[in-house]
């Protein structure tokens, strides 16, 4: 790391893009999905290739280095280094051209794979290299890594699908690397030198390079052998060490037709390994392995448990997911028959003493196939969901061997693990002999670091025995580069060094990768180095499910393995702030890294620092990460700890108090509703009040009702339903509660409002208090609810609520505020209005001839409560229900009203929600249970949304 004064000043002067050197930003770019951590000199978000050229020139002059970075999902340390990090993802992310006839695409390096394939879908094309990180990995990163995926058996790896690369070399020259025909100038000299090296080393390359498809270790110098040389193939897999990629020309493929999956079950792992070489003779496009540990862990993850139960029979020790795409349903069906016959020929059947237990579960339903594929793609993250101190560690995770040796290789590696007192979990690409396996180790302990090296050395000897590759998919980085001499020999490594020297004489481009690498077990480069520690500190919520300081808060934070699932741009909800800003700071990963630095003393000021608060600024507490992050990062809950620490340090502003104590002053405000509502009507008052209240003058506030809901409106004797009347529906939209009471009674239930008989003050979920970090007061409110509902809950009476962010607090934050059996009983008794009614068969409803568009609240999605709502709406006779596929609406309580966050709030809605409603018919019924969602829709579209209770009340047939 260089002193960054002069470097930083020059970057600020010469670069149009963003330049960052503050500790928090450097921390967020110091790690990837590997075990390593290196603090960069600066981070640059370039806007153009001119920015890139300026950075390379400045870094060269200042004695720094340059690290091109895409999604930061590398598992081997390729994308951590000192020097200047160039983040390509925010601006250099355009699809430049698509030639449909020739099936060629030209893209900038920051284009995300899923983004490209979404654009190609309309043409019936796709880019067929499909790594599991497709939702966030970039094409530039894929080329630099020589990535592959589950379908490489049919489509090959990245090198097989790159036609040309435009790149900037370290001297600032931009050149096109492609099939060699005629070349001139300096580029001709470079080509000539590389061809000479290829001729000189051809025999050694042929003798030393593994004869397996999955071989991505070192430079692709075999691409320099022969007459048909494509110079771009030398750059593929070079891990940013030779040049900066500005444009990639890619070969495309026709989208495969209908697919089917045969799930082969095996009672033993070895049986699955032995069967693989026979299964690939059926010409599937993928054969993927899942072992019993991955099945067990997946069943504990909410978003995967239902899927697993749908395709797994019994308790297999291993599954092989065999995918066929033959172009027609008939051909696919025939392949499934062949697969079943083959399994029978191999001696497997689900019944019969004469067979080994096993067989095929056929999956033809498209939605289930997609769910299975998503589960398999999340394999690493599922593995990392273990809450213990040890984690599955990547360092021998993608060795590749010939299929006939696969069973013996896996048995040998299992023996190595056992000899060192650990175990591994297996999954991934059985079809090409490249299985992912990670031994469980604790990288904080010296003994486990020594074990890692011993396992690596023994494993690579085993790989050599079977003439395999020590790097089959994930590249070299820090973790494998030092072993090239063991695997390739001195002469090949010398050739690697000559290539590096020819392209980059002074080692400016991502030094220490592929050649001249540090030791893989150098703890000074570890995320959890020898000096890493987290001193004990006080937290306000219960984190006892995890190990470590802060009552387990440390362990919860350290669950983040930097896989980057939170950087996806489509599908699900996570992470709405990142989708809006494209800033690493605003992804769940960026926040988790910041938290880790804060609690370990690596970021000044700790949890209460301004930098930490700024990191949380755009977090809307949507809870999407709690459900969609496979390692279970609950950033909304972690944000509460940050807000609590900040409040204890600095107290509350007037604006904070207006939010936090809304339930307490609401009864008084409602009495003068006419006066309070004047703020929306008088422009000057909006502007004058913006500063002290923290409410943007650009927003209308919710309108106070002059006739708020009163508890006495629903106090049936011996109630069968306890209704929680939240502050938002009680004082702003009381007709929602009245409609809910009518619907519940029409369904035959006696209804009573949950209330505190010891106080005149209405019950409160504490949500507004938590939003401002007032945890002790929120805990008091939670205990009031627990006490008030105790007797009814003990009798089995359900507690039902309308506002998702309020009622679902009972199932979530209450468990962390007041842990104990009574809270768990309340949590189990709690349901949303639609969850309760979805189980009731006798709901008298009239037909509705208007289309219904449903927007789910983030907390409904996080708790799996959208499906019951969808099912309930479909019970309306004649209903045409359309589910809006959107992330967070962006209002998120106070977030959308703040002058500091209103623009990001609107941007979130503009990504998915607003476009969906723009095409909705004018007579459509828009259903949104969240009060914030309804207000965002009202302000940003021509539609008015309603709560599902109002719609059901409207169509009641009584």
Predicted regions located by residue number:
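Terminal amphipathic helices with adjacent charged low-complexity linkers/tails
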Residues: 248-250, 282-390, 424, 428-430, ...
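Iron-sulfur cluster-binding electron-transfer modules in prokaryotic oxidoreductases
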Residues: 504, 511, 636-958
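A glycine-rich phosphate-binding loop feature that marks nucleotide/adenosyl-phosphate handling sites
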Residues: 74-77, 133-140, 213-220, 224, ...
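C-terminal substrate-binding/cap subdomain adjacent to the FAD-binding core in PCMH-type
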Residues: 34, 142-144, 148, 152-158, ...
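Long hydrophobic segments that form regular secondary structure
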Residues: 226-242, 255, 260, 267-282, ...
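N-terminal glycine-rich flavin-associated loop
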Residues: 11, 34-66, 84, 88-131, ...
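N-terminal flexible segment immediately upstream of the FAD-binding catalytic core
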Residues: 1-61, 71-103, 155, 241-259, ...
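Ferredoxin-type iron-sulfur electron-transfer modules and their immediate structural context
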Residues: 385, 389-390, 465-470, 477-618, ...
